[in-house]
UniProtKB/Swiss-Prot annotation:
Domain annotation Fibronectin type-III: ranges: 108-205, 206-306
Domain Ig-like C2-type span(s) in chain numbering: 27-104
Subunit structure: Forms a heterotrimer with LIFR and IL6ST. Interacts with heterodimeric neurotropic cytokine composed of CLCF1/CLC and CRLF1/CLF-1. Either alone or in complex with the heterodimer CLCF1-CRLF1 interacts with SORL1; this interaction may promote internalization and lysosomal degradation.
Span of the signal peptide: 1-22
Protein name listed in UniProt: Ciliary neurotrophic factor receptor subunit alpha
Residues linked to a glycan: N60, N70, N142, N190, N261
UniProt GO MF annotations: ciliary neurotrophic factor receptor activity; cytokine binding; interleukin-11 binding; interleukin-11 receptor activity; signaling receptor binding
Disulphide-bridged cysteine pairs: C46-C89
Length: 372
C-alpha cells in the first residue's frame, strides 16, 4: 500500500505537466473583432481575467503605458482612427497571452446618394450610388428595383462596384420605377429611394471624336465634325440632336448653336487668327436631358502667309560704284560722251544713261547758238 503512494504522486505531476504543456503549445484563439465609433470612449477587458489581475497590454506589438489601465482593463478615450489595431493582454509574470482584440474605429453610414440614368436608351438604364462621407469600416449595399409592383433584377457592373444595370421590360411605359438602396455596417444603417418615369432619366453620353479644322482661304471659318456616342444603340430609330458651343481663348463668353441633325457644322463668325475651343453635347430628339460636354477641340482659323517682297532699297549692296546694277528700261539709250560734245558746243556732263528726248533737245539748242 505504501508503494502505491509514489505512483499516485507521479501521476498527478505528469497530468499537471501535460496541462501546462497543452496550454502553452495549443493554437492561439482568434482575436475578438470589435467596432467602435470615432470620438467615443471604450473599455477593453482582458478576457476572463479578474479586475485585479497583473497584466500588460500591447497594441500591434508595442507596450502601452500603465496609466491607460484600470485594473486589468484598458481604457481608450476619444477614439481616433489611429486607435485601430490589434490589442493583446499578457500575464505580467509569465507573459502568457490572455486575450486579443482587433479594434476597428469608424462611423455609421449617412444617407447614400442614389442616381439612375439611361445612356443606352431604349435598351435599359443603370443606377449608381455612393456615400457622402466615409465610414472607415466595411459597408454592405442592397439595391431593390420596382416597376410598379414588379421586382426587377439589377445586374452588378463588372467594373464598377457601386453600379448595377436594369433592362427595360416594357418600352414607353407610363408606370413609374422605384429604386431603393440600403447601406449598413457594424455601427449602423441608412436608406434612400427615388421614383421616376422612364423618359426623365434618358441622358446620352457626350459626342465623340470632336475635331475642328480651319477652312482654306476663309479667315473667319472653322469646320467642326463629331460622331454620335458609341453607347447610343440605335441612332436611326432614336436620333440625337446636338448643341455646339465655342469661344476664342482670349474671351470667357461662349457662343451657342443648336443643330437638329447632322454631325458637322461650320462656324462663320470666328475671329481671324485667334485660337478657339469647341465642345459638343447631345440629346434625344424628344425626351431626356442634354449630355455632358464633349472633350474640347482646339483650332485656329486660316491665315494668309505674309508675302516677302524685295525692293531696290531693301536689296543688299554688292558694289560701291555709283553705276546702277539694274538694266536700263526700253526707252533708255546708252550714249557716248563724244557724241554730246561734237560741233564745238559746250560739253554736257557725262551720263551713263540719257533718254533720247533729252539728247534731241540738247542738239537743237547747240544749232541755235551757232546761227546767232
Amino acid at each position: 500500500m505504501a508503494a502505491s503512494v509514489p505512483w499516485a504522486c507521479c501521476a498527478v505531476l505528469a497530468a499537471a505537466a501535460a496541462a501546462v504543456y497543452t496550454q502553452k503549445h495549443s493554437p492561439q484563439e482568434a482575436p475578438h473583432v470589435q467596432y467602435e465609433r470615432l470620438g467615443t470612449d471604450v473599455t477593453l477587458p482582458c478576457g476572463t481575467a479578474s479586475w485585479d489581475a497583473a497584466v500588460t497590454w500591447r497594441v500591434n506589438g508595442t507596450d502601452l503605458a500603465p496609466d491607460l489601465l484600470n485594473g486589468s482593463q484598458l481604457i481608450l478615450r476619444s477614439l481616433e482612427l489611429g486607435h485601430s489595431g490589434l490589442y493583446a493582454c499578457f500575464h505580467r509574470d509569465s507573459w502568457h497571452l490572455r486575450h486579443q482584440v482587433l479594434l476597428h474605429v469608424g462611423l455609421p453610414p449617412r444617407e447614400p446618394v442614389l442616381s439612375c440614368r439611361s445612356n443606352t436608351y431604349p435598351k435599359g438604364f443603370y443606377c449608381s450610388w455612393h456615400l457622402s462621407a466615409p465610414t472607415y469600416i466595411p459597408n454592405t449595399f442592397n439595391v431593390t428595383v420596382l416597376h410598379g409592383s414588379k421586382m426587377m433584377v439589377c445586374e452588378k457592373d463588372p467594373a464598377l462596384k457601386n453600379r448595377c444595370h436594369i433592362r427595360y421590360m416594357h418600352l414607353f411605359s407610363t408606370i413609374k420605377y422605384k429604386v431603393s438602396i440600403s447601406v449598413s455596417n457594424a455601427l449602423g444603417h441608412n436608406t434612400t429611394a427615388i421614383t421616376f418615369d422612364e423618359f426623365t432619366i434618358v441622358k446620352p453620353d457626350p459626342p465623340e471624336n470632336v475635331v475642328a479644322r480651319p477652312v482654306p482661304s476663309n479667315p473667319r471659318r472653322l469646320e467642326v465634325t463629331w460622331q454620335t456616342p458609341s453607347t447610343w444603340p440605335d441612332p436611326e430609330s432614336f436620333p440625337l440632336k446636338f448643341f455646339l458651343r465655342y469661344r476664342p481663348l482670349i474671351l470667357d463668353q461662349w457662343q451657342h448653336v443648336e443643330l437638329s441633325n447632322g454631325t458637322a457644322h461650320t462656324i462663320t463668325d470666328a475671329y481671324a487668327g485667334k485660337e478657339y475651343i469647341i465642345q459638343v453635347a447631345a440629346k434625344d430628339n424628344e425626351i431626356g436631358t442634354w449630355s455632358d460636354w464633349s472633350v474640347a477641340a482646339h483650332a485656329t482659323p486660316w491665315t494668309e502667309e505674309p508675302r516677302h517682297l524685295t525692293t531696290e532699297a531693301q536689296a543688299p549692296e554688292t558694289t560701291t560704284s555709283t553705276t546702277s546694277s539694274l538694266a536700263p528700261p526700253p526707252t533708255t539709250k546708252i550714249c557716248d560722251p563724244g557724241e554730246l560734245s561734237s560741233g564745238g558746243g559746250p560739253s554736257i556732263p557725262f551720263l551713263t544713261s540719257v533718254p533720247v528726248t533729252l539728247v534731241l533737245a540738247a542738239a537743237a539748242a547747240t544749232a541755235n547758238n551757232l546761227l546767232i
